[in-house]
Every structure is written in structure tokens, then in C-alpha cells.
Amino acid sequence: MSLSFELLKAKKVDKQLIVLDDPISSFDSIYKNKIAYAIIKFLSDKYSLILTHNTDLIKLLEHQLNNSFTLYYMNNTEGENNGFLKINDNEKRILLYIPSLIKLFSSEIAHEILNEKAFLISIAPFLRGYCYLIQNNEKKDALTKIMHGYETASTNLSSLYNELFQTDIIKNEHIISASDILAYHIDNLDIIKKDKFPLLAKTLIHSFTYLYLRMTVEKKLVDKYRIDTTNNCMLNQIINKAFPNSKKDLENTKNRIFFLSKKTLLNEFNHFEMDMNIFQPAIDITNKALENEKDEILKKLGSL
């Protein structure tokens, strides 16, 4: 209600540009659609600059009034490409519409891939979420086996990808195991071309890095502390088992807090079962922040 009054006040002022800062972040989903409607209704005669990290609002605005906005990615990090970076129509389409993203992965992406193996690994978490969505448990389980650092199984990612998307764009056979992912050199990844899909290119590099870090932490902790993964298969369980809660062991507490607090080790950065938005993690963290967190995690693992 209070936001509606603020929008009504904004409608009455003589200024043509209205700035809204993350208008739906603190609201339940039941109100989000109403807020999007109110923004369009009250501010239809003005220009609006809406700042948000929530793609739900972007989708709601698009569905209520098609092609009503230009989308930008805002960045302000030393050493990076900064300012308001326009998201082109190609990426706007696949960000807003899951069917367009699936269509891209089944055909158009073929001309953009620079490294097939890296592409397949980077998209593995999304593939698993897609399998969960369409209830293909066999392929979901096969992907799960290569997404945990302590596992030894391997799977043919080429055939799995082609079968899932009913395509033949992956030409070479890539049989991948967890050890293959852990052995990958992740500095200076180049997965797809950046001219047509720059945000997707960034996203896939991030996705690969998140997966690599999670798996590396799992592998190190399971091996070093001889953890039985039968009942401790998830990363948070492994961390708690490696560093059990003890008032007498402050080092354990520090290590546990360190790993549990790292953003890139959260499930949300690797799991798409509840949200098929492949872009959200990459929108939430800058390249520099990811690089710093990667260095911190690997340094901590090396000190154990």
C-alpha cells in the first residue's frame, strides 16, 4: 500500500524521470505481480529507471507490457567493464523466456561454442535442473554422479546433451568424470563467443567456476577427514562433518564458518531444481568478486 502511494506521488511530480530501487525485493510473490502492474499503471507517462537484481520483476514487466523497457546490466568494479551495459535483444529474449533458452541450446548455440568440453561441463548443473523439470531421473542421476568431487563415475555428456535437447550439435564425444572436472585449468576460461551473447558467456564461466570450487572442497574434505559420504553426501553435511561444532576447538569453528559462509558454495549457485534462471548467479557476483573468492577458498584448502 505504501509503495502504491509513493508511485501515485511520483506520478504527480513534474519530473519526467522516476528512479525505483529494487521495488519488489522485500515482498512476497503474491504482491509482485500487483507491484509490476502499479509501476506500469502509475508511471505510464514518465520514464522510469528501475534498479533490481531480481529477474522476477523483469519478467513480470515484460509479460504485462511487452517490449516496454530497455534492459541494462549495471557494474561498478575496479578493473572491469563498468557503467550501464546494455543487454542485447538476443540475451533479453533468452533471459525472459525459458523456451527461447532451450531453443538456443538445441540449435543456435552451435555456432557460438569455442570449447565443447568446457561448454558441457559449465552447463551440467543447468542440465540436471532441466532433467529434474522434465522428470528424466536417469539422466539427472548420471549428472549428479559427476557433480560431486568424491564420486568416480563418468558419463557421456555429448550424447546426454544431444538427447535432452533433441539435437546433434555436439559433434565430439566427451566422456566426463568428476576427476576430469577437478583436473581442469579454470583460469582464463573461454567457452563461447562473447560478441552475440556476452552475459551468457560470463554466466557459463561463472557456472564452471562455482561447480569446480564446490567439487574441489568436497574432494579435499572427504579425503582428508575420511568422511563417509553415504550419509554425508551434500557439501554442507561434509563441511559440518569435517569441522564438528566444539567450544574447545576454535579452529574448527573458524573453518566451518569460512566454508559455510562462501557465496559460491551455496546450493543456489549450482542447483537449478527450483529456479531455471541460468543467469541469476552471474548477475549476483562480479568477475572480480568471484576471482577473489576462488583464491580465498583454494588458499584455505591448501592450508588444511
Regions found by a protein language model. Name each.
Residues 1-19, 33-42:
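GG-anchored amphipathic helix commonly corresponding to the ABC/SMC/Rad50 NBD signature/C-loop
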Residues 14-15, 44-46, 66-70:
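Short glycine-/polar-rich loops that comprise or flank the Walker A/P-loop
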Residues 26-29, 33:
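Conserved D-loop-proximal element of ABC-family nucleotide-binding domains
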Residues 47-53:
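Structural recognition of the conserved hydrophobic beta-strand(s) that form the central parallel beta-sheet
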Residues 53-56, 77:
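Acidic/histidine-rich catalytic neighborhood
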Residues 58-68:
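Short regulatory helix/loop adjacent to the ATP-binding pocket of P-loop NTPases
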Residues 64, 75-304:
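Acidic, Mg2+-coordinating catalytic modules of nucleic-acid enzymes
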